[in-house]
Amino acid sequence: MSRSLKKGPFVFYSLIKKVDQMNSNRFKSVILTWSRSCTIIPIMIGNTIGVYNGKEHIPVLVSDQMIGHKLGEFVQTRNYRGHKKHDKKTKTKR
């Protein structure tokens, strides 16, 4: 189910303030956020946002193709290490 158009996209207010400050300054740094559910809006383009994955902040460089998506879509929360490898030598017949 999608969000109602009259409500608009969800963006954390303090994140917008931080992005505006970075856009007004020449100095660019990583903006840390724990809000993975924020929608990416056009003023965020070109900024690097550190999105929390449950363990650490992963830097995400926002581009124009990301507009309308959520920040959490670009950071994995689970590590897939592959299936266990089986040794044919250690297998015993019964």
Swiss-Prot record:
Alphabetical UniProt keywords: Chloroplast, Plastid, Ribonucleoprotein, Ribosomal protein, RNA-binding, rRNA-binding
Organism superkingdom: Eukaryota
Tagged with keyword tRNA-binding: no
Protein's UniProt keywords contain Hydrolase: no
BP terms from Gene Ontology: ribosomal small subunit assembly; translation
Molecular functions (GO terms): rRNA binding; structural constituent of ribosome
Subcellular location: Plastid, Chloroplast
Cellular component terms per the entry's GO annotation: chloroplast; mitochondrial small ribosomal subunit
Any matching Pfam family: Ribosomal_S19
Disulfide bond sites: none
PANTHER family: RIBOSOMAL PROTEIN S19P FAMILY MEMBER, SMALL RIBOSOMAL SUBUNIT PROTEIN US19M
Family: Belongs to the universal ribosomal protein uS19 family.
Protein role: Protein S19 forms a complex with S13 that binds strongly to the 16S ribosomal RNA.
Protein's name according to its UniProt entry: Small ribosomal subunit protein uS19c
Organism of this sequence: Euglena gracilis
Organism placement in taxonomy: Eukaryota, Discoba, Euglenozoa, Euglenida, Spirocuta
Gene encoding the protein: rps19
